[in-house]
Swiss-Prot record:
NCBIfam families: FeS_repair_RIC, PRK10992.1. Its main location: cytoplasm. GO terms for molecular function: metal ion binding. Di-iron-containing protein involved in the repair of iron-sulfur clusters damaged by oxidative and nitrosative stress conditions. This is Iron-sulfur cluster repair protein YtfE. It comes from the Bacteria. GO terms for biological process: protein repair; response to nitrosative stress; response to oxidative stress. It is found in: Cytoplasm. One of its GO terms (cellular component) is cytoplasm. Belongs to the RIC family. YtfE subfamily. It comes from Salmonella typhi.
Length: 220
């Protein structure tokens, strides 16, 4: 099957572990989920035939859960527990680790300068964003008022883009979240944590942008 003309967001939802494959190639399937596989491959200089073959292999596996068929209230409950609560735990710990690494290794050329500042900005951005979702948007959707939520959803999507831009900056200052040879245990653990946080955030944004919001606006 040809996947090149399909949007990344759709492929991430319909093919098991496609999201992990896209992360491997640094393809944005959440905020950039509307771009086709062909366009994303061209932007990242990836051989389209190779990634299509990899997706075909993944597509042979059974999909764990098709969120496109799950009730919206259940999706919202899953988002809050699986992602909102997790981000609230992850980011303060990562900020503490970044503060330590930047202080202890200040003289090292590969130290991720500014990482604490950018993680703090992301934490503040997401804290405000998630509170607005939980207090305003999610109750509207649960009450069947998704069609009237065009304004709040537009704001949330814009804030998703802003969070994605901060993630790009974090990836830049950490050399794509790759620890250098001299990295200590804390440094390596922090980068593992950052990768986990980015994975969770991309899954979170993808589920909202590509499933929850379109279905809510359609009046489900």
């Amino acid at each position: 099957m040809a996947y090149r003309d399909q949007p990344l967001g759709e492929l991430a939802l319909s093919i098991p572990r496609a999201s992990a494959l896209f992360r491997q190639y640094d393809m944005d399937y959440c905020c950039g989920g509307k771009q086709t596989l062909a366009r994303a491959a061209a932007r990242h200089d990836v051989d389209i035939d190779i990634i299509e073959a990899q997706l075909a292999q993944l597509a042979e596996q059974p999909i764990e859960k098709d969120w496109r068929a799950v009730p919206l209230a259940d999706i919202i409950d899953h988002i809050v527990v699986r992602y909102h609560d997790r981000h609230r735990e992850q980011l303060p710990e990562l900020i503490l680790q970044a503060t330590k690494v930047e202080r202890v290794h200040a003289d090292k050329p590969n130290v991720p300068r500014g990482l604490t500042k950018y993680l703090t900005a992301l934490h503040e951005e997401l804290s405000s964003h998630m509170m607005k979702e939980e207090q305003i948007l999610f109750p509207m959707i649960k009450q069947g008022m998704g069609r009237q939520a065009t304004g709040p959803i537009s704001v949330m999507e814009s804030e998703h883009d802003e969070a994605g831009e901060l993630v790009d900056v974090i990836k830049h200052v950490t050399q794509n979240v790759t620890p250098p040879p001299e990295a200590c245990t804390t440094w390596k653990a922090m980068y593992n944590g950052i990768n986990e946080m980015i994975d969770a955030l991309m899954e979170h944004i993808s589920l909202e942008n590509n499933v929850l919001f379109p279905r809510a606006l359609a009046g489900e």
